[in-house]
């Protein structure tokens, strides 16, 4: 996933063909040409950028920052996510992902400018689930996402915050304490 020009659909094709990330990563052009639906240009781009990736340095960087990861071949990769059409090849996370019941989740999606009505009703719904093993899953933007995670924590629920920005910076910065609370015992932040 360190090669920006390569998307998860490409990685999924490699994984499906080779059955192993390491074999896929070390493939040559002739092997890549055998993969149905994979253009020669995409294969050549992969080889060009692959040779610039320092796997050991990337791994050390992830590890020293306290970030964990799962790949598609990991038995702990969430089953529901693995079964979507184009699952992420790698999930990076901080926190206690496996304390969350990934079989019982409540997904919350809503506006960054949520109305008072939406905020209040979401709090009521989540408080009704308090002290159960349901895990709340939402983005970590402002608005309804923040309400969902805050309500989950207030009601002793595990929660998973999904971010698109990676772990280099927190967005919005007003959610810094929320990120830390999730990572430090109330679930996980996933990128």
How would you describe each model-predicted region?
Residues 1-128:
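Short, positively charged patches
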Residues 71-191:
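Glycine-biased, small-residue-rich flexible motifs in mid-sequence functional cores and linkers
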């Amino acid at each position: 996933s360190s090669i920006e020009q390569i998307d998860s659909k490409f990685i999924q094709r490699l994984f499906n063909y080779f059955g192993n990330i390491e074999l896929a990563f070390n493939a040559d052009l002739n092997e890549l040409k055998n993969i149905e639906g994979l253009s020669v240009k995409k294969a050549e781009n992969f080889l060009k950028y692959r040779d610039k990736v320092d796997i050991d340095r990337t791994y050390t960087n992830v590890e020293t920052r306290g970030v964990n990861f799962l790949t598609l071949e990991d038995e702990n990769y969430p089953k529901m996510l693995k079964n979507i059409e184009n699952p992420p090849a790698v999930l990076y996370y901080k926190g206690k992902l496996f304390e969350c019941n990934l079989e019982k989740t409540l997904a919350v999606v809503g506006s960054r400018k949520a109305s008072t009505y939406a905020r209040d009703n979401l709090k009521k719904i989540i408080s009704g689930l308090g002290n159960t093993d349901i895990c709340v899953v939402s983005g970590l933007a402002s608005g309804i996402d923040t309400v969902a995670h805050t309500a989950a924590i207030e009601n002793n629920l595990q929660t998973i915050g999904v971010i698109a920005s990676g772990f280099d910076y927190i967005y919005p910065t007003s959610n810094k304490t929320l990120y830390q609370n999730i990572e430090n015992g109330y679930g996980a932040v996933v990128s």
